[in-house]
Design a protein with these regions (language model features):
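Acidic, turn-prone loop/beta-hairpin segments
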Residues: 1-31, 60-150, 154
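Short helix-adjacent coil turns
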Residues: 34-41
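Aromatic-lined ligand-binding clefts that engage carbohydrates, nucleic acids, or primary amines
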Residues: 43-47
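Hydrophobic residues within the alpha-helices of tandem HEAT/HEAT-like
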Residues: 50-51
Length: 154
């Protein structure tokens, strides 16, 4: 059921706050790159976020939360966080990969009904929320990722 209210920020686990912090940092960076007419840098930043952080870390570390039984607040938070990331990424990449972004966006909103627009190109471009950016948390997680990568490389 996609009508559940969003889980409060303070009740979200640290891993959700981390990926949403990175997402807000990404929105800020991509907006700056596009304003500076640097679409290649914007595209690379989006790709790095999706591949390195969303897919390789967030989704992998949260498999149990996604597949656990029952719809707990923790599971709802995980689903809402992932949905927010995917919807925002679709909007961010719309100027760079218009057809793919539109298909991703339409597939998401067809299920949830959260946006009443016919295309990602008719939706508002994301605006970052500075209060959701936690550079300390981002740095701590980056350190954990670096250590994990070093151990795996041995």
């Amino acid at each position: 059921d996609y009508s559940d209210p969003d889980v409060e920020w303070s009740k979200r686990p640290e891993i959700d706050r981390w990926i949403l912090s990175l997402l807000n940092s990404l929105v800020k960076d991509v907006d700056g790159y596009l304003e500076a007419y640097e679409p290649t840098r914007a595209g690379r930043a989006i790709s790095d976020f999706v591949n390195d952080n969303l897919s390789n870390w967030y989704v992998r570390l949260n498999r149990r939360r996604f597949w656990g039984g029952g719809m707990t607040e923790d599971k709802l938070s995980a689903y809402q966080t992932l949905y927010t990331c995917l919807e925002t990424v679709a909007k961010l990449m719309a100027p760079i990969a218009p057809f793919y972004a539109d298909q991703l966006f339409l597939d998401l909103v067809a299920v949830t009904g959260r946006e009443n627009v016919e295309s990602v190109h008719l939706s508002d471009f994301p605006v970052y929320d500075e209060s959701k950016i936690d550079k300390n948390l981002e740095e701590r997680m980056q350190m954990a990722q670096d250590v994990s990568s070093m151990v795996a490389a041995r």
